[in-house]
A protein has these predicted regions:
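Short secondary-structure junctions
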Residues: 25-32, 64-66, 157-161
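A non-catalytic alpha/beta surface segment that caps or lines the substrate-entry region
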Residues: 2-43
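Solvent-exposed alpha-helices and their adjacent loops that cap or buttress functional pockets
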Residues: 39-40, 118-123, 173-175
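Catalytic-core environment of secreted peptidases
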Residues: 38-78
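His/Asp/Glu-rich mid-to-C-terminal helical/loop segments that flank catalytic regions of hydrolases
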Residues: 189-254, 258-260, 265, 283, ...
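Acidic/histidine-rich catalytic neighborhood of metal-dependent amide-processing enzymes
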Residues: 54, 74-151, 161
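Zn-dependent metallopeptidase/amidohydrolase metal-coordination segment
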Residues: 45, 160-205
Length: 327
């Protein structure tokens, strides 16, 4: 089995090729299709991670600091090589189903391709666990509001429910009609070259996931979507999700203070969508010819605008954007 540093130094195609071989060595019948690897297991839990990172430059050097942090001058890509490595360790002991997606960072492309196949209809699992969350003890459920599932995960892992933005399970849950959670995987400062990984945090998630997978549950957990209450301006959940706080936390390489936000963008999006009003996004990006270039996208929600932008510009990372504005 390759080391974590080895996984970090691979390109996405190299990760896909290696994981196909690795899962095959663990007695999986691996399905390799455009956008994903899928391997059905004996334990009714689907493990999810993505194989791409935001970094253009290949990671060639992994350093270990005195305080136990793993990093790279090229960007270590813990988002989401941590998730891949966690799954590698879990399937050595637990023969769960596995889904590894391509191009999550440019719009959950691989996950969306998977939802258009017949595999999504025949998962035969009770729930899904994704490993694509920063930090060390977060459990993010996004639009899933199945209280029984939320309580089950929190009780078995000891993690705390946290707000999240968007990831592969955000599109997998409604398509599969199954609940899912995204667990912290030990990386920090994602989407920057200052990203680092805390080894023991990643190992703690592996142990927490084992406890969750081994815990008994009563059949599949249905996906119950959060609902937006227009009368009081809130989402039907324990938290009011702020869609962009985690999804787009960087502007010109600097991180916003999360405490500065008062009005969740999610609520504004919902109100705009209800009124069927178009939102326009202007994005200023670097340009080799004219130094700067403006791009324009429109949609019913801010999320829709950003999705179109990243699908059209897969080579652009968010922290390369000079500035942007909605109107």
């Amino acid at each position: 089995m390759k080391s974590f540093a080895d996984i970090c130094k691979m390109t996405q195609p190299e990760v896909k090729a290696y994981m196909k071989s690795f899962l095959g060595s663990k007695n999986y019948n691996v399905i390799d299709e455009d956008g994903f690897l899928y391997a059905k297991g004996d334990i009714p839990v689907l493990l999810v991670a993505h194989m791409d990172t935001v970094h253009k430059e290949k990671c060639t050097e992994v350093n270990l600091s005195e305080d136990g942090r793993l990093s790279s001058p090229q960007g270590i890509g813990g988002d989401d090589r941590c998730g891949v490595f966690i799954i590698m360790n879990l399937v050595k002991e637990l023969h769960c189903s596995v889904l590894l997606c391509e191009d999550e960072e440019i719009g959950t492309v691989g996950a969306r391709k998977f939802t258009k196949t017949d595999y999504i209809k025949n998962l035969d699992v009770n729930y899904m666990i994704e490993f694509d969350r920063k930090g060390n003890s977060d459990a993010v459920f996004y639009t899933c509001d199945n209280k029984e599932f939320l309580d089950f995960v929190i009780e078995e892992t000891g993690f705390e429910e946290a707000r999240g933005s968007f990831s592969d399970i955000s599109v997998l849950m409604p398509a599969a009609k199954l609940s899912a959670v995204n667990l912290s995987s030990g990386y920090y400062n994602a989407h920057t070259v200052n990203e680092y990984v805390v080894w023991h945090d990643m190992m703690d998630t592996i142990e927490a996931a084992k406890e969750l997978i081994k815990a008994e549950c009563d059949g599949p957990f249905e996906y119950i979507a959060k609902t937006y209450n227009y009368s009081n301006g809130s989402w039907g959940s324990r938290y009011r999700d702020s869609f962009y706080r985690d999804m787009y936390p960087y502007s010109n390489g600097y991180q916003f203070s999360m405490d500065d936000y008062e009005d969740p963008f999610h609520e504004n999006d919902a109100k705009m969508a209800k009124d069927n009003k178009d939102i326009e996004l202007e994005v200023i990006i670097p340009d080799d010819v004219e130094v700067e270039k403006a791009l324009y996208y429109s949609g019913n929600t801010k999320a829709e605008c950003w999705m179109d932008f990243f699908l059209d510009n897969p080579d652009i990372c968010f922290n390369e954007i000079i500035t942007y504005a909605f109107s």
